Every structure is written in structure tokens, then in C-alpha cells.
Amino acid sequence: MRRTGIRLSWRSVDDLALRPKTLDEYIGQERLKQKLRVYLEAAKARKEPLEHLLLFGPPGLGKTTLAHVIAHELGVNLRVTSGPAIEKPGDLAAILANSLEEGDILFIDEIHRLSRQAEEHLYPAMEDFVMDIVIGQGPAARTIRLELPRFTLIGATTRPGLITAPLLSRFGIVEHLEYYTPEELAQGVMRDARLLGVRITEEAALEIGRRSRGTMRVAKRLFRRVRDFAQVAGEEVITRERALEALAALGLDELGLEKRDREILEVLILRFGGGPVGLATLATALSEDPGTLEEVHEPYLIRQGLLKRTPRGRVATELAYRHLGYPPPVGPLLEP
């Protein structure tokens, strides 16, 4: 397809090239980075592998990216896998015995989804760097002990409550990733723009950051879509005005609410008088899966003060009424 009128400069850079390589390049999470610098320097001074590390927090905050940064800072290799991919102990043994060298890092995303059998075989690997494998079946079965290289396990989870106590106790370092500020998200947008050869104003980057739900992954995604609109329009620079037009075209309002988020609040207000209403009833009214409603949409609405979960059900707040342009209920709100 022939393209015309496109004046934005373009540089072919893949996601790996955009990924920061050092803690200094990694934007945000300042308190965590300060502690990590200490842990990394101490491990390098002792010439020992970094202690096993568990990172937890909502999706899209950069847990995988941080694992890559840690590996780069230590000058070691990183092997990436996920809990669901390790179905049986043999899968774990193949990774630990064949893919890792002394000091390397194994990153397991969604570690809370490890099978119980695989998790139990992980315990001695984390503690003593050995793993016992049963060969054969029945009376002829025998156990072989695998000596493993001293490695670091970095686990990542969005649901720390599902991590079993025995597994949690084997992590020497447990850290939480926090949501980003709009200013930090704008910095991430500006960095990606520079690497991609795209010109964008700080004001435009900040508008993207304000609508990114405190999540760097969302900010990067929105920036790419805003870039698309500006590129097709033949703009040389992404200005605040162009960014606002693109974000509006994407269905995002000034709080970062998408169309589905607003529909949830509107149904709650217009059909159920603001609530309280049970999750299952609300999901049925929206033709939505209750799990999607609870895990995908509600957390951000609650963080923004637009929705409350109460013992009697979901309640729209006064702020939700005002944001959507509806008069709030007269008198005290339905639930405190």
C-alpha cells in the first residue's frame, strides 16, 4: 500500500530495543531501585548469585523488564518462562540442568500458577541447588540427584495471596511494584519517542500519561496509537492538541476511562439507582463475565474513587455521578 503525506520520522526499533538495560534507564519505582542497587552491589562484592527475588504487583508495571535489567546489571544470562509452562518436574529439571550456568537468572512469570508437583521440586533447587528426579516406574524406579548451578530465581505474580507459604519463605527478597505517576509515565513515553525517532511535546506525553491507569504498558500502547494518528495526519510533531484528538478517538476520557468502564457506571447509575447491586446481577445486565468485571474493570474504577465494593454490592460514588454528568442522589450516598 502506497503511503503519502507522512512526515513523522520513523525508525524501526523492536520492543527488545526499547527495553531499558540498566536501573538508571528504568523509569519509576525509585524506592525499589534504591534497594536493588544495594542488593546487586552486595552480591557482586561477595561474588555470589543474587538471593531469590519475588516481585509482585498489578500487571503491566514492568516486572519482566526489571528481571532483564537485573540480569544485565549482574552480567549474567536470563532464562524466561512462566508457571503454566512448567507442567511437570521434568520440565523444571530440563530448564535448571540444561539452560542455566553459574549465577544465571531463571525468571518465572505467573509463578503462582506452578503445579504443586513442580513447586515441591523447586524447593530443594532453591535451597540447596539440587533436584531429585525419579527414573522409571514401579519396583525398578530409582532416584537420580541432579547437581544444579548456583542460580537466582526471580518470580513474578499479580496475585501474591496465591503463593504458598513454603514457596514464599524461600525467597530472600520480596518486593512490591507500585503504580506510576503521570509524570513518570510521560517520561516513559518521551524515552520511547526518542528511540523511535518520533517528536512529541512534553505536554502531549503528559496527557498520555494521565490516561494510562498508572501502568507503563498502557502508556506505551497509547503512545503507539497516538503516533499512528499523528503519522497518518502528516504531523511533524505530536502536540498536546493532536494527542487529545487521538485519545478521544480511542474512546478515552480525561480519567483514562474506556467506553466499557463508562458503561459499567452508567448501568449501575441508570438501571440500579447507583446500587448497591451484586456482582453477578451487574455482570448479567452488562452481558459481561463476572471475572472480567471484577479483575479487569473494577480495580481502576475503585482506585479512581468511582466505585465502591460493599457487603451489599457495588455502589457508584458521587464522583461517578459527576464525572458522567448525572446529578448525584439527594441526601447521603447509598453506602458510606
Curated annotation (Swiss-Prot):
Mg(2+) binds at residue 64. It comes from the Bacteria. It is found in: Cytoplasm. Keywords: ATP-binding, Cytoplasm, DNA damage, DNA recombination, DNA repair, DNA-binding, Hydrolase, Nucleotide-binding. GO terms for molecular function: ATP binding; ATP hydrolysis activity; four-way junction DNA binding; four-way junction helicase activity. Residues 254-336 are annotated as: Head domain (RuvB-H). Its EC number is 3.6.4.-. It is an enzyme of class 3 (hydrolase). One of its GO terms (biological process) is DNA repair. Signal peptide: none annotated. One of its GO terms (cellular component) is cytoplasm. It catalyses: ATP + H2O = ADP + phosphate + H(+). ATP binds at residues 18-19, 60, 63-65, 127-129, 170, 180, 217. DNA binds at residues 309, 314. Gene3D superfamilies: 1.10.8.60, P-loop containing nucleotide triphosphate hydrolases, Winged helix-like DNA-binding domain superfamily/Winged helix DNA-binding domain. InterPro entries: AAA+_ATPase (IPR003593), AAA_lid_4 (IPR041445), DNA_helicase_Holl-junc_RuvB (IPR004605), P-loop_NTPase (IPR027417), RuvB-like_N (IPR008824), RuvB_C (IPR008823), WH-like_DNA-bd_sf (IPR036388), WH_DNA-bd_sf (IPR036390). Residues 181-251 are annotated as: Small ATPAse domain (RuvB-S). Has 3 domains, the large (RuvB-L) and small ATPase (RuvB-S) domains and the C-terminal head (RuvB-H) domain. The head domain binds DNA, while the ATPase domains jointly bind ATP, ADP or are empty depending on the state of the subunit in the translocation cycle. During a single DNA translocation step the structure of each domain remains the same, but their relative positions change. NCBIfam families: PRK00080.1, ruvB. This is Holliday junction branch migration complex subunit RuvB. It comes from Thermus thermophilus (strain ATCC BAA-163 / DSM 7039 / HB27).
